Amino acid sequence: MKPTPKAVVIFSGGQDSTTCLFLAIKEFGKENVEVVTFQYGQRHAIELDKARWIAQDLGVKQTLIDTSVIKAITTNALMDDQAEIKQTGNTPNTFVDGRNALFLLYTAIYAKSQGIQTIYTGVCETDFSGYPDCRDVFIKSMNVTLNLAMDYNFNIRTPLMYLTKKETWALADQLGAFDYIRTHTHTCYLGVEGGCHTCPSCLLREKGLNEYLEEKGNV
């Protein structure tokens, strides 16, 4: 008898990863979905509380992995409370070198230990933030690398890769999770409850939300 397929979601408690979680639950069933959350020294630590609450509320197993050692070898505005968030060249200073590679590697190690092949991550290159590790070419490359490194058939899914934020809100609505995601998820880089309305992450989220609500109101 074949084992029941399962999935693991790289989960921050934000809009994108929570949308992926609802997608995974819809396809695999709540009892067959887990989430992995990373503590990497992020200044918006409130997201860890949100992730914990959402996982408990939806009844999915959460594994917390501490990768904060990365603070000893790199610096950026996402991990420095005193840094001003700004664009530096083509890449914003909120970019954490190696973060998504690290997340995927650790998640894959965990997934294999649990007999899980499907990994969801909410990366997206449409509303491009300038993060090189959010590009489809990187994810595909990492998928091949992990399969070779562990001799295992991982399937990394990126359902939001080519969606705008407006389309991501629309997807949440289709999943019956619009109000839940709007109310309970955290996106703000500065860690402000309800959003600061000024950081790039808040502005992108609010722009997409307003565009979707305007479109929905005109239908």
From Swiss-Prot:
UniProt pathway: Purine metabolism; 7-cyano-7-deazaguanine biosynthesis
Cofactor binding mode and count: Binds 1 zinc ion per subunit.
Xref: InterPro entries: QueC, Rossmann-like_a/b/a_fold
CDD domains per record: QueC-like (cd01995)
One Gene Ontology biological process: queuosine biosynthetic process
Gene3D superfamilies the UniProt entry points to: HUPs (3.40.50.620)
Keywords: ATP-binding, Ligase, Metal-binding, Nucleotide-binding, Queuosine biosynthesis, Zinc
Transmembrane stretches, start-end: none
Binding site for ATP: 11-21
Catalytic activity field: 7-carboxy-7-deazaguanine + NH4(+) + ATP = 7-cyano-7-deazaguanine + ADP + phosphate + H2O + H(+)
Key word Transmembrane helix present: no
Keyword Nucleotide-binding: yes
Binding residues annotated for Zn(2+), in chain numbering: 188, 196, 199, 202
E.C. designation(s): 6.3.4.20
Cofactor requirement: Zn(2+)
GO molecular function, one term: zinc ion binding
Family per similarity comment: Belongs to the QueC family.
Record HAMAP family: QueC
Function: Catalyzes the ATP-dependent conversion of 7-carboxy-7-deazaguanine (CDG) to 7-cyano-7-deazaguanine (preQ(0)).
Protein name: 7-cyano-7-deazaguanine synthase
Taxonomic placement: Bacteria, Pseudomonadati, Pseudomonadota, Gammaproteobacteria, Pasteurellales
Gene this chain is encoded by: queC
